[in-house]
């Protein structure tokens, strides 16, 4: 069970959609809108988990996950720059896997080919490279590696 004294893991609140959009804009070249985050927060087939600093309540990392039947896709996962280097992304991914609906047996994600740290983290969690999506990312343009984990360990 994922536990850290310095972080609280929970789902995003509707009041945080604008802040998530702001963080998203700082981190990704192709950011999601506030409306997109609101839609995900209220969706019955999407999750928007966050890792918040236990003392301050400040969001340290966030993700956006969608699922249909037995398959999930991690659409976003990011650590706020000032919180990087503390294993927070790893902890959030572990929390996601522990809290994803029981019927999910496969998780997919795309990752920038240049994001070696994230690729290594995913491999350590048992994800494998399934393929490549040419020119998937913009700003800057880059290929994505499609990674998958066939069975979520419970």
Role assignments for model-derived ranges:
Residues 2-4, 11-82, 93-99, 150-154:
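Acetyl-CoA-dependent GNAT
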Residues 45, 70, 115, 137-143:
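Short acidic/glycine-enriched loop/turn segments that link adjacent beta-strands
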Residues 70, 105, 128:
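Short acidic/polar active-site loop segments enriched in Thr and Asp
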Residues 72, 86, 145:
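Glycine-centered loop/turn positions within well-structured domains
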Residues 77-94, 112-120, 124-125:
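Conserved glycine-rich acetyl-CoA-binding loop
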Residues 93, 99-110:
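Conserved GNAT acetyl-CoA-binding A-motif
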Residues 108-110, 123, 128-145:
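Conserved catalytic-core motifs of GNAT/GCN5-like acyltransferases
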């Amino acid at each position: 069970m994922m536990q850290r004294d310095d972080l609280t893991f929970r789902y995003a609140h509707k009041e945080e959609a604008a802040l998530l959009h702001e963080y998203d804009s700082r981190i990704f070249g192709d950011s999601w809108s506030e409306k997109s985050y609101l839609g995900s927060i209220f969706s019955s087939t999407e999750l928007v988990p966050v890792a918040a600093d236990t003392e301050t309540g400040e969001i340290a990392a966030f993700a956006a996950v969608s699922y249909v039947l037995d398959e999930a896709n991690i659409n976003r996962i990011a650590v706020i720059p000032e919180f990087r280097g503390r294993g927070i992304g790893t902890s959030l991914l572990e929390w996601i896997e522990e809290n994803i609906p029981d019927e999910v047996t496969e998780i997919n994600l795309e990752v920038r080919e240049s994001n070696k740290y994230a690729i290594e983290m995913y491999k350590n969690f048992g994800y494998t490279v399934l393929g490549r999506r040419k020119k998937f990312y913009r700003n800057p343009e880059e290929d994505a590696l499609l990674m998958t984990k066939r069975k979520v360990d419970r």
